[in-house]
Amino acid sequence: MFNLKLNFMSYDFKYADLLDDDVFKLVFGRESTKDVMIEFLNQVIPDRKIVDLEFIDKEMHPVERDAKGVVYDMFCKTDSGARIIVEVQRRKQPFYPERAIYYSTFQIQRQVEAGADTYDFLPVYVINILNFKMDGNKDRADVKSVYRLYEETTQRLLTDRVTFIFIELPKFKKSIDELDGNVLEGMYFCFKNMAVLEECPKVLTHQIFRKIFEVSELYNMDQDTRDKVIHKMTTERDLRNQMAYARQEAIEEGRAEGRAKGLAEGRAEARRELCMSMLEKGLSRETV
C-alpha cells in the first residue's frame, strides 16, 4: 500500500515542498539538476524540443530609471535562444496575468537593440506554476492553459514569439492510484504532494523522478538549508491550519446564525398564521 501521509499537523517531513522558492531552485535551477528542468520544460512546451539550456541572472532592471524592476524565480535560455521565465506562486495575487505580461516585456526589450532596423526577437515563454485557481479561468478544467496573441474573430495567430502558460495545481485531482505514468501529471502530483510523501511512488518510473526525490529529501541538504526549509514548511503548515480553523469557525457561526434566524422566522410565521385564523373567525383587528 502506497504511503501518503495526510496528517497536516505532523512536522516530521521527509521531503521538502517543491513550491518553496529555495527548494524549487535546488531541484530545477542548478547545473547539476539541469536535466530536471529540461525534462519539465519539454513536457510543458511539447512543440519546442529543448536539448540544453543556460541559467541566467534572475534580476531584471528596468530600461527607465523610475520603472519597476523584477526578480524571476527562474530564468533560462535554451539552446535555440528562446527565453523562458518560470514563476512559482503559492498564494493568489491581484492582477497576476498582468504581472506575467509585464515580466515578458523585459526579455523582449533586451533582445531588440537600440537603433536596430527590425523588432525581431526570439520566443519568450512565461511559465506560471500556481497553487490557486485564476479568476476568469475557474470553469476551465484543464490544469495547463496556454495563451498567445490571436485575432479575435478568425483566431489567427498574430505571432508565436510570446507565450504565457499557467499551471493551476488545484485543478489536478488525480490520486496516486489514478496516475498512469504520464510524466507531466507525475510532476503535477509531486508539486502538490511532495511534502507529505514518504517515498517515491512506484508509478513514477521516469528517471527524472529519482533525482527529484533525491534532491528534495531534507537529509540530503546541508544543515543551514535544511533548517531554513523546515522552518518555512512548518510556518506554512501552521498558517494553513489556522486558515482551515478560521474557515470552520466561520461555517459554524454561520450555521448558528442560520438556526437562530430560522427560529425567529418560524415564530413570526406562526404568529401570522394565528392572526389570520383569528380574523377568519370574525374577531376584530383591534382584538387580534
Located regions from the model:
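Generic recognition of short, well-ordered alpha-helical interface segments
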Residues: 32-36, 95, 179-182, 207-211, ...
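Short, charged alpha-helical interaction segments and adjacent helix-coil junctions
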Residues: 2-13, 84-89, 189-287
